C-alpha cells in the first residue's frame, strides 16, 4: 500500500513539471544558405603541333652550252674566252644595262691611203678603196667606237653599238692625212679614229710632228694609242727587257708629256709580241694589245686566235693562243681586204644572237642557282 502511494505521487510530480515547460519558439532569423559551389570546367588546351619542315629540294644547275661556233669563222682561228668567273660573265652578258649578245666589233688596220696616180704597195689602199670600205661599213649599220669603249665592252660588256668598228691608223701621219680622210666621217657619223703613234723624239722633224699632233689631239676626235718608240724592231721573243720597257714605258712618258694622257692599248710594232712583252705591258697597266693577224671579229668573251702556225696563214702569222691573254693579242682586219668580210661578219653577229637566245633560259637558270645568292639578280 505504501509502495503504491509513493509511485502515485512520483507520477503526479512528473506530470506537473511537464505542463509548466514553455513552448519552443520558432526561430525568426533566416538561415543564410551557403551556395553550392559550381565547378566551371576550363577548356583543355590543345597542344600546338609544330609541323615538320619539308626538305627543300636541291636544285641542280644545268650544264652550260659550249662556246659559240660559226661556219663563217676559219676553223684554224678558233674563238678563245678570257673571263674565268662564270657568274660574272653571265651577269654581264645578260644585264639589260649592257650590250646585247651578238654585239660585234671589227678592228680595221690602216697604213697608207694613196692619192690617184700613186703606186699602191701591198699594205696600202687607194682613195677609191678607202671610200668603198667606209661606205660598206656605213651601209651595213656599223658605227665607230674609241679604244676606251672597246675596252669597256671586252672587259665588262658595256654598251656599244651592235655593229661596231674601231679604225686604227698605224705609224705616223700628218694632221692633213687625218683631216682629209677621217674628219668627214667624224663630222658625218661621229666616227672617231685611233692614231697608233710612234713616240720618237730624235730631231727637229719629230718636234714639229709632236706640235702638230698636240693640236690634233686637242680637237677630241683622234684617239691616240701607243705604237712604240723605236718601232722598227718588234717586241717579239728574244729582245731584251730593257728594249721592251723602252718601247712601252717610253710611249707612256711621251703621251703624258704631249697629250696629258696615258695610253691603254699597245699596237704591237710589226705585229710582233711575246709572253714577256705582254707580261711587262700588263705591269704597266696596258689593257689591250693589237696584232696584225686578221683572224676575225671580236665579241664579249670571244676572241678568235691561232694556236699554232698553219699552212692557211703561213709562218708570218705568229700564234697568239699559247700566250693565254686574248685581250693583249687582238686581231685586226687589213684595210686591203676588210670589205669582202663584212657580210660574213654581220652573219656571225646574227648567228651569235640566235645561239644566245636558244641558250638564254639555261644560262639564266644556272645563274639563279649558282650565282644569284652571291651576285644578286641580274638587272
PLM regions and their residue ranges:
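Substrate-binding cleft of extracellular glycoside hydrolase catalytic domains
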Residues: 149-150, 159-191, 219
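Short loop/turn segments at strand-loop or loop-helix junctions that form parts
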Residues: 108-113, 198, 226-231
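C-terminal motif of bacterial Sec signal peptides marking the signal peptidase cleavage site
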Residues: 14-16
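Extracellular mucin-like PTS domains
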Residues: 25-60
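Acidic (Asp/Glu)-rich catalytic clusters
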Residues: 182-190, 204-226, 282, 319-323
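Bacterial signal peptide processing site
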Residues: 18-20
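C-terminal active-site subregion of NodB/CE4 polysaccharide deacetylases
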Residues: 53-167, 234-236, 240-265, 271-379
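Sec-dependent signal peptide recognition
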Residues: 2-10
